[in-house]
Amino acid sequence: MNMQESKSIIEVNGVSKFFGEKTALDHVTLNVKKGEFVTILGPSGCGKTTLLRLIAGFQTASEGEIKISGKEITQTPPHKRPVNTVFQKYALFPHLNVYDNIAFGLKLKKMPKQTIEKKVKAALKMVGMTDYEYRDVDSLSGGQQQRVAIARAIVNEPEVLLLDEPLAALDLKMRKDMQMELKEMHKSLGITFVYVTHDQEEALTLSDTIVVMSEGRIQQIGTPIDIYNEPINSFVADFIGESNILNGVMIHDKLVRFCNTEFECVDEGFGENMPVDVVIRPEDLYIFPVSEAAQLTGVVQSSVFKGVHYEMTVLCNGYEFLVQDYHHFEVGALVGLLVKPFDIHIMKKERVCNTFEGKLIDETHVEFLGCNFECAPVTGIEAGSEVKVEVGFDNVILQDNEEDGALTGEVKFILYKGDHYHLTVLSDWDENVFVDTNDVWDDGDRVGITIPPDGIRVIKN
């Protein structure tokens, strides 16, 4: 890659976006190289579309700055930025035919008629719609309308093309066809693509670089292979493809314990007996009739044919493993599992308990999360002191009836850890509460939150 290609065309530096008291983006920093195909990936509400709209100029950053080609454009209106945007809903003009839709921006610039005709025909050729220039847009299929929207965007020869979930409205086959066309188009045009999606497969297929977002923050930036093979945390591991994610303990370098069993691994630099997250992809587990080679033995709980492989759930020592393999084992079969050291991925835990800022009210009461909680008797700390409050994940109780809780919240993220669920609950105090539970909840569930006195640990600041 030469110096020109490696130069950043988009620089997002410490950008935040607030909507009232809600933080949509939290100090985001991102550099996009010229000519890259970058995909911003994340679940609904993670901030990916907000970031795209800030780059496009449809919204203004609350903090930080944005540069394109070295020029600061944070406050620059959209029509003065060297970018064009393709939307999910296409935004074509129904009263104009295909040619006039594509030519619209060029006519606004008062370009000569011959120049417009040349550019429009080149754009139509690029998207494979040479014979459609005089068709009404309402007569086109969804895929054809999307091609027209892309042609209208590229005809202006922008430095950056922004695409906001442009394939979401298409059926599966058309979406896959358009993915390949977009990839070829990017290669031919040589301009920078910034693509927003919640579809992990789409991101892995299209991108040079993937930016994974959650809760207004960037979690990881890397190539599709790096993101898939070396996720930085349990959120990324769970969001990108299927994963077995379990609690483990790093005994020492290259030796980890999980599922009540010790395994050799290749990871180093963790502290002895440090709690860690262990990630194993389903395709990296070997399954076979029980033999001495088995590291774990278990019983097949379910088996589903997926076309290119079987997907099986195996219960070992009370932990469920998802396994993908070409060999089929019947439900109820006793099997062995084996995983090679380099297929065990070790990640430092982001946290080992809930930690909150609080205030000691008296010997047996502490205030945090906007509530007054009863706690075990506290000694050596004066009433009224600012304190740190620790609550174990398994010490938080969730209830169906919100009124039964000391406070309320909404389930935002669910991670299965083999023998329990690890939930992220956004409290109405706008702080996350992390919960380990065997109960089954759904994203978006409203819950009451209770913490028993013996589950609260008060620590002097």
Swiss-Prot record:
**Under which EC number(s) is this enzyme classified?**
7.6.2.11
Query: What class does this enzyme belong to in the EC scheme?
Result: translocase
Write down a Pfam family by its short name.
Answer: ABC_tran
Where's the ABC transporter domain? 10-240
Q: How does it sit in the membrane?
A: Peripheral membrane protein
Where does this chain mainly localize? membrane
The family database entries (CDD domains) matched by this protein are listed as: ABC_PotA_N
Question: Its catalytic activity?
Answer: ATP + H2O + polyamine-[polyamine-binding protein]Side 1 = ADP + phosphate + polyamineSide 2 + [polyamine-binding protein]Side 1
Keywords, ordered alphabetically: ATP-binding, Cell inner membrane, Cell membrane, Membrane, Nucleotide-binding, Translocase, Transport
Q: Where does ATP bind?
A: 42-49
GO MF annotation list: ABC-type putrescine transporter activity; ATP binding; ATP hydrolysis activity
Q: Where in the cell is it found?
A: Cell inner membrane
A Gene Ontology term for the protein's cellular component? ATP-binding cassette (ABC) transporter complex
Q: Which InterPro entries match?
A: AAA+_ATPase (IPR003593), ABC_SmlMolc_Importer (IPR050093), ABC_transporter-like_ATP-bd (IPR003439), ABC_transporter-like_CS (IPR017871), Mo/tungstate-bd_C_term_dom (IPR008995), P-loop_NTPase (IPR027417), PotA-like (IPR005893), PotA_ATP-bd (IPR017879)
Q: What does this protein do?
A: Part of the ABC transporter complex PotABCD involved in spermidine/putrescine import. Responsible for energy coupling to the transport system.
Q: So what family is this one in?
A: Belongs to the ABC transporter superfamily. Spermidine/putrescine importer (TC 3.A.1.11.1) family.
Subunit composition and interactions: The complex is composed of two ATP-binding proteins (PotA), two transmembrane proteins (PotB and PotC) and a solute-binding protein (PotD).
Extract the NCBIfam families matched here: potA
Q: Tell me the protein's name.
A: Spermidine/putrescine import ATP-binding protein PotA
